[in-house]
C-alpha cells in the first residue's frame, strides 16, 4: 500500500516535492523513496490513538502532538497548522521518536487480540505483562543496535516494562497519565481485525523482527504475537489475558 500510494503521489506532484509519511513503523519512508525517488520523503509520527467507530467517523482517544522531520519547505506552513489546532513538533532526526512510538505501538497487537477498549485492556494485569515482555525484548535489541528511543509518553522508554508489571492498584496510581484514555479508544489494529482488513503488524512487530535479524538475535515474543495476528480470521475469538500470556510464554 505504501509503494502504491507513493507512485500515485509521484504522478500528481512536481519532482522534489516534500512528502511526510505519518504511518506507524520505521521503514515506510524507505519503501516510499524506492517507489517514488523523484519526491523528497520525510518522516512523520502521529502520537495519539485514532479509532474508526463507524464508516467516516474517526475518534481521537488520546492526547499528543504530531511530530515531523524538519524541512525548509515546512516553515511557512507551521502557522497554518497551529491555527488549525494541529501544532507540529519539528525534529532534525525523527528516528528516535519513531522508535519511541513503536515501543508503545507494540501494545496494538495485544489490544487487538483482547477485543477490549484500550483502557480496559491496560487495567488487566495479564495483558500488561504481555506488552511488557514485547517492549523488554525490543529494548534489548535497540540497546544492541545502539539506538536510543526517545521518550514519547509520560514514562521513559526503559521504565515501561517495570511500570506495566506493577500490581493493579499501584499501576492505577502510578500510571494515571497513561490511563487518561477515552473509554471508546481502541488500537488501529483492533479496527483492522474487526473489519477483516490487512493489519500493520509488519510495520510494528515486523520492524522488531527485522532488527533482530540484522543483529543476529531472536525476538520470540514478538514473533509469536505476530503469528497470532496474521492467523486471525473472522471466526476467531478474543483471547483472555491468561491465554495470551500462556501462548507468548510470558
Each language-model region and where it sits:
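Glycine-rich beta-alpha junction loops
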Residues: 26, 45-50, 72, 94-98, ...
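Rossmann-like NAD(P)(H) cofactor-binding subdomain of soluble oxidoreductases
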Residues: 1-57
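Short phosphate-engaging motifs
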Residues: 1-2, 28, 73, 109, ...
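NAD(P)-dependent Rossmann-like dehydrogenase/reductase catalytic/cofactor-binding core
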Residues: 82, 132, 136-250
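Short active-site oxyanion
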Residues: 15-19, 63-66, 214
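Internal alpha-helical scaffold of NAD(P)-dependent oxidoreductase catalytic cores
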Residues: 12, 35-40, 57-155
Amino acid at each position: 500500500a505504501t509503494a502504491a500510494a507513493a507512485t500515485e503521489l509521484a504522478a500528481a506532484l512536481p519532482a522534489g516535492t516534500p512528502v511526510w509519511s505519518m504511518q506507524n513503523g520505521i521503514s515506510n519512508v524507505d519503501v516510499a523513496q524506492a517507489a517514488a525517488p523523484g519526491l523528497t520523503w520525510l518522516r512523520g509520527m502521529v502520537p495519539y490513538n485514532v479509532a474508526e467507530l463507524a464508516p467516516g467517523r474517526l475518534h481521537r482517544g488520546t492526547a499528543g502532538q504530531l511530530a515531523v522531520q524538519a524541512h525548509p519547505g515546512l516553515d511557512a506552513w507551521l502557522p497554518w497548522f497551529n491555527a488549525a489546532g494541529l501544532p507540529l513538533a519539528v525534529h532534525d532526526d525523527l528516528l528516535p521518536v519513531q522508535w519511541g512510538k513503536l515501543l508503545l505501538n507494540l501494545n496494538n497487537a495485544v489490544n487487538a487480540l483482547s477485543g477490549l477498549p484500550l483502557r480496559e485492556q491496560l487495567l488487566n494485569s495479564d495483558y500488561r505483562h504481555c506488552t511488557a515482555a514485547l517492549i523488554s525484548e525490543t529494548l534489548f535489541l535497540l540497546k544492541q543496535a545502539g539506538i536510543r528511543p526517545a521518550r514519547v509518553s509520560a514514562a521513559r522508554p526503559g521504565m515501561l516494562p517495570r511500570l506495566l508489571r506493577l500490581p493493579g492498584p499501584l499501576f492505577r496510581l502510578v500510571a494515571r497519565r497513561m490511563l487518561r484514555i477515552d473509554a471508546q479508544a481502541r488500537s488501529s489494529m483492533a479496527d483492522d481485525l474487526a473489519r477483516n482488513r490487512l493489519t500493520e503488524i509488519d510495520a510494528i512487530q515486523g520492524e522488531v523482527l527485522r532488527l533482530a535479524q540484522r543483529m543476529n538475535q531472536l525476538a520470540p515474543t514478538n514473533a509469536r504475537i505476530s503469528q497470532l495476528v496474521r492467523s486471525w480470521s473472522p471466526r476467531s475469538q478474543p483471547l483472555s489475558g491468561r491465554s495470551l500470556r500462556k501462548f507468548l510464554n510470558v
